[in-house]
């Protein structure tokens, strides 16, 4: 190997070392959580208001005669999902409206948070059933029993993120929800 090839090889090795060191240092400085916008921390809806088990939500829907809101989200990585939660779902206006009008179901596809395998399987099946291509997506459904003992989730509408806060979001979904 001649001197120019040795010099070139050393440069490549040195550049790879510097690049690896720089990337490693940058990765250590990335915050592990996304900060909430100012003014959103004061109102947190009851976490138990959001079901994760669809069968429990169906039972509640039968009992209350309310439709189910299926919220497909990537809670720990999807920027638009986090915005929707902060700007709409974590507000007093939405919490009050939801308690009166729908059964809330969170169908989460996290990257960092662990979930029971049964929830992962349920969420994957529902994602395929509703052909969800992106997050956040909210499907509104009414469960209806079929003659063969199964349950049909009749779609009544869908929505995702939209600007305008809780009032605009609620006005949009109220257009297709059953009237009381």
Residue map of PLM features:
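Bacterial N-terminal signal peptides that target proteins for export
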Residues: 2-14
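Bacterial N-terminal signal peptides
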Residues: 12-24
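Boundary at the C-terminal end of the N-terminal hydrophobic targeting segment
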Residues: 25-27, 35
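Thiol-based oxidoreductase modules, predominantly thioredoxin-like and allied folds used
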Residues: 48-51, 94-121
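Short active-site neighborhood of thiol/selenol oxidoreductases, capturing the structured segment around
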Residues: 64-78
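Typically the conserved alpha-helix immediately C-terminal to a functionally engaged Cys/Sec
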Residues: 81-97
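Non-catalytic, surface beta->alpha helical segment in thiol-disulfide oxidoreductase systems
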Residues: 87, 128-180
